[in-house]
C-alpha cells in the first residue's frame, strides 16, 4: 500500500491574497490554504474589492470622457494567458513578469519588464509587513477560516485608519 501522492503538495498553513492601492492601503483580502495556487485566487481578490473603481474619467472643459486604465502589478506566480484574459475582462491592465523555464537565459526585454514590476512590488510586501505586526495574526491560532478572515479585516481597517485618518500615508505629520 502506498502513501499520499507526493505531487499533491498538501502544505499546512494559509495564504493571504491582498489587493492594495499604490500607497499600500489594502482594498481587498482573501484567505486560502497554502497549497492553493495563486492563479486560482486572483479573480476572487479583484471581485471582492470593497471600493469599486470608476473606469471613465470626468470630462475636462472642452474635452470628452476618456477611459481610465487601472494597472495591476502581479508577481511571476500569476503568469498565464487565462489569468491575463480574466484581468483584462475586469478592466485592468496586467503587468506580470515573464516566467522563464529552468535553463532558459533571461532576455533583456523580459529583464526590463521584471524590473518595472519588481520596483512596484515592494508596496505589497510593506503591507504584508504592516499586517505581520499584529501579534495575533502573525501565527494563526484560529481554527475557523471565518474567524481568521475577520481578524485580518479588522487589522486592515486599523491599518487604513492609521494611514488615512492619522495622516501617515500622506506625510501630514
What residue spans do the PLM features occupy?
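Aromatic-acidic/polar surface patches that form glycan- and anion
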Residues: 35, 144-147
Amino acid at each position: 500500500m502506498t502513501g499520499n501522492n507526493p505531487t499533491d503538495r498538501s502544505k499546512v498553513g494559509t495564504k493571504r491574497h491582498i489587493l492594495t492601492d499604490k500607497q499600500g492601503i489594502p482594498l481587498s483580502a482573501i484567505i486560502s490554504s497554502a497549497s492553493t495556487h495563486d492563479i486560482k485566487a486572483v479573480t476572487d481578490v479583484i471581485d471582492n474589492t470593497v471600493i469599486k473603481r470608476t473606469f471613465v474619467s470626468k470630462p475636462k472643459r472642452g474635452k470628452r470622457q476618456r477611459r481610465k486604465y487601472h494597472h495591476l502589478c502581479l508577481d511571476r506566480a500569476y503568469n498565464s494567458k487565462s489569468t491575463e484574459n480574466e484581468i483584462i475582462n475586469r478592466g485592468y491592465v496586467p503587468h506580470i513578469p515573464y516566467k522563464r523555464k529552468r535553463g532558459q537565459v533571461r532576455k533583456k526585454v523580459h529583464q526590463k519588464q521584471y524590473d518595472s514590476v519588481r520596483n512596484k512590488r515592494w508596496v505589497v510586501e510593506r503591507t504584508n509587513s504592516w499586517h505581520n505586526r499584529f501579534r495575533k495574526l502573525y501565527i494563526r491560532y484560529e481554527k475557523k477560516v471565518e474567524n481568521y478572515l475577520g481578524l485580518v479585516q479588522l487589522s486592515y481597517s486599523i491599518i487604513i485608519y492609521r494611514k488615512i485618518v492619522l495622516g501617515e500615508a500622506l506625510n501630514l505629520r
